[in-house]
């Protein structure tokens, strides 16, 4: 195989870049290690800054987002059981869009299909070769275990911190700037109405909490937990009880709880 550009990683960054290149008539191939079903169902972040919204709209993937997404003109911060609102619109003339990464990725895949961009899923043993030469190579095994080699002028890594691309940066060129916190966010997704029409970021002596949403009937909540904690330690009832303690009273008094449909811990 031969492509002008090979993108490793079929998430939103890789697929948006693939779309931009395809619209510029650049031949591009996307390699993704997970199944298409997994990529289109995984739960990730749900709030988009407006420059991202503009970029999606500019590249033809904003129609469903405009119809189903929620525009927020501010957010709430709380501490010591008091909350106040930061008005984005009046302060900096900006907004944010609540529209889940799952939905963004779905829209991007649909648009890539129109442009006939090839995405190969379930690739394994990906290796990048001859990076410093005029033509580079990517080798991989497909889902049937068959070896493949792709020639390319440009190879772009969009496969994240744990992806194979990062490991190919020469050690003398790699600079790492990071702060690792001793805690993570325990997140719960539930088919319940959001507790607030805008997000609530809560500071509490027991730890941080966030009240977010995906739509008017799908809520996303987080609480800060130690990195050593396990999902098995948290029943739904325990999570809701702890969340109520950390949210301001005016929110916790109206919180509607229900069974979780997804639960995970994200390290920070």
What are these regions (language model features)?
Residues 22-43:
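Glycine-rich FAD pyrophosphate-binding loop
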Residues 126, 133-149, 153-268:
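Conserved FAD-binding catalytic core of PHBH/FMO-like flavoproteins
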Residues 41-45, 49-115, 132:
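Active-site-adjacent segment of FAD-dependent monooxygenases/related oxidoreductases
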Residues 1-13:
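Beta1/beta-strand and adjacent pyrophosphate-binding region of the FAD-binding site
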Residues 113-125:
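A conserved beta-strand/loop element that lines the FAD pocket in flavoprotein oxidoreductases
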């Amino acid at each position: 195989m031969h492509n002008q550009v090979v993108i490793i990683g079929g998430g939103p960054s890789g697929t948006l870049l693939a779309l931009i290149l395809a619209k510029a008539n650049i031949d591009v191939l996307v390699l993704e290690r997970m199944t298409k079903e997994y990529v289109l169902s995984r739960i990730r972040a749900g709030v988009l800054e407006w420059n991202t919204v503009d970029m999606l709209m500019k590249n033809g993937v904003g129609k469903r987002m405009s119809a189903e997404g929620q525009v927020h003109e501010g957010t709430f911060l709380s501490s010591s059981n008091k909350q106040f609102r930061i008005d984005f619109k009046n302060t900096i003339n900006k907004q944010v869009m609540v529209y889940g990464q799952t939905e963004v990725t779905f829209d991007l895949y649909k648009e890539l299909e129109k442009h006939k961009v090839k995405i190969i899923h379930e690739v394994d043993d990906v290796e990048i070769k001859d990076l410093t030469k005029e033509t580079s190579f990517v080798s991989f095994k497909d889902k049937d275990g068959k070896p493949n080699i792709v020639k390319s002028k440009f190879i772009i890594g969009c496969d994240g911190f744990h992806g194979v691309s990062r490991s190919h940066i020469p050690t003398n060129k790699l600079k790492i700037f990071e702060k690792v916190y001793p805690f993570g966010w325990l997140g719960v997704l539930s088919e319940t109405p959001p507790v607030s029409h805008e997000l609530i970021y809560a500071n509490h002596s027991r730890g941080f909490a966030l009240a977010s949403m995906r739509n008017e009937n799908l809520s996303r909540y987080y609480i800060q937990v130690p990195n050593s904690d396990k999902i098995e330690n948290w029943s739904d009832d325990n999570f809701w009880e702890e969340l109520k303690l950390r949210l301001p009273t005016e929110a916790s008094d109206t919180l509607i709880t229900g069974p979780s449909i997804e639960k995970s811990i994200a390290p920070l």
